[in-house]
Amino acid sequence: MKIAICDDNEAELNRIRELLEIYACDKGQKFFIKCFTSSVELASTAEFEKYDIYFLDIIMPVMDGINLAREIRAFDRFSPVIFLTSSPEFAV
């Protein structure tokens, strides 16, 4: 499974990657995880390199996670997008 993670906070990015690696190991799965600290970089890469699932921070500079998801949806309508944030304004 190819997974893209995008978060401008490197500590959070590494934490998510580590949790996914632990999960993959526990389940006997193989994950290819690519990390991005720039939403613009992921937007330009994802059009040519498809991922099975996207984990996106909501609040990022230049392009937020919501607009990044819109960019991704323009060429990938089916891969799941999971939004992540530590901001209480988006809490459910």
Question: What does each model-found stretch correspond to?
Answer:
Residues 1-2:
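Non-catalytic signal-transmission and effector/linker regions of two-component phosphorelay proteins
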Residues 7:
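Conserved acidic carboxylate
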Residues 10-34:
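Two-component/phosphorelay signaling modules centered on CheY-like receiver
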Residues 14, 44, 92:
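Alpha-helical elements of the RecA-like P-loop NTPase motor core of helicases
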Residues 24, 43-45, 71-72:
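Short, flexible, glycine/charge-rich loop motifs used to bind or transfer phosphoryl groups or to couple energy/partner
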Residues 35-53:
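Acidic, metal-coordinating helix/loop segments flanking the phosphotransfer/catalytic sites
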Residues 51-92:
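CheY-like receiver
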